Regions:
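Phosphodiester-processing cores and adjacent nucleic acid-binding clamps
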Residues: 1-118
Length: 118
């Protein structure tokens, strides 16, 4: 079976769009043997800390360090993201046939800490 991961998921922090809790989503991905999960809530990252914290509560041993200590990583890799709103002109509030609604959604995912900082 091919490897699959959900990379565009809304949680309870996407009002009117998502209902699943971060913990339940993460547990379901473990149950389904998915290697990663990205949460991409609408216009906010309120669940990011909870999401990464949840991931580090459920880890696996991937090796030993030079001192013989276990090296741990999350069972399912947490990918932090957000579905941002993109507009050409944020001051336009009404639209007509001539002035079309040019609002878009753009999903951005952070590959690592540097990506998150950007």
């Amino acid at each position: 079976m091919p490897t699959f991961s959900h990379l565009h998921v809304h949680t309870q922090y996407s009002l009117l769009d998502g209902a699943a809790s971060v913990e339940k989503l993460y547990d379901k991905d473990i149950e389904n043997n998915m290697p990663a999960l990205a949460i991409t809530d609408h216009g906010n990252m309120f669940g990011a800390f909870e999401f990464v914290s949840q991931a580090w509560k459920k880890t696996k041993i991937v090796g030993k360090d030079a001192f013989g200590n276990d090296i741990l990583e999350p069972i399912v890799k947490p990918v932090v993201g957000c579905e941002f709103y993109v507009v050409e002109d944020m001051h336009i509030k009404t639209f007509t046939k001539e002035v079309k609604d040019k609002r878009y959604h753009q999903v951005l995912l952070a590959k690592n800490k540097k990506g998150y900082e950007n």
